[in-house]
């Protein structure tokens, strides 16, 4: 398991709320919580930036982290990330914030400590562009959106 430096920015973490941990040995994501001062209603169409009470420093340029929505919030309540996916670069050291967007039709209550998103670490490959005039032809070629069919 890779060690990642974390700063606790909110003293409620480790006291009222646990440090993020993997729920099972097969879990890919760590739950991030809303470390807000008081609960509030996220109105339909509204977006708010929510603090998690943590900052991380990955340090390894071969790793990054992504903040992803929790599937139940999106499917059941229409609550997704305002930026769809949050990318945390290996050299970022600031606070982890979650942009929450209510795309549903009803207000959604967010309480202090609610699990609002998940943090997943992913490998990174930095690419260097090689300028060419033509590509080696493939069966797919330039076929894009919907090109491979429904089945």
UniProtKB/Swiss-Prot annotation:
UniProt keyword list: Hydrolase, Magnesium, Metal-binding, Nucleotide metabolism
Recorded hits in InterPro entries, A to Z, give: dUTPase, dUTPase-like, dUTPase-like_sf, dUTPase_trimeric
Instruction: Please give the superkingdom of this protein's source.
Output: Bacteria
Has keyword Magnesium? yes
Binding-site positions, substrate: 70-72, 83, 87-89, 97
Its GO biological process annotations read: dUMP biosynthetic process; dUTP catabolic process
Family as reported in the entry's similarity comment = Belongs to the dUTPase family.
What this protein is reported to do is described as: This enzyme is involved in nucleotide metabolism: it produces dUMP, the immediate precursor of thymidine nucleotides and it decreases the intracellular concentration of dUTP so that uracil cannot be incorporated into DNA.
Task: Please state what the protein is called.
Answer: Deoxyuridine 5'-triphosphate nucleotidohydrolase
Q: Which organism is it from?
A: Mannheimia succiniciproducens (strain KCTC 0769BP / MBEL55E)
Q: Which gene encodes it?
A: dut
């Amino acid at each position: 398991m890779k060690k990642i430096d974390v700063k606790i920015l909110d003293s409620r973490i480790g006291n009222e709320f646990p440090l993020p941990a993997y729920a099972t040995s097969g879990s890919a994501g760590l739950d991030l919580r809303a470390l807000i001062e008081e609960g509030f209603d996220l109105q339909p169409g509204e977006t708010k930036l929510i603090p998690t009470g943590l900052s991380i420093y990955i340090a390894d340029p071969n790793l990054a982290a992504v903040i992803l929505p929790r599937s139940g919030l999106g499917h059941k309540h229409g609550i997704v990330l305002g930026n769809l996916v949050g990318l945390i670069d290996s050299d970022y050291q600031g606070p982890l914030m979650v942009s929450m967007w209510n795309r549903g039709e009803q207000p959604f209550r967010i309480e202090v400590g609610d699990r609002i998103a998940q943090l997943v670490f992913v490998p990174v490959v930095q690419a260097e562009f090689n300028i060419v005039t033509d590509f080696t032809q493939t069966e797919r070629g330039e076929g894009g959106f919907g090109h491979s069919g429904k089945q």
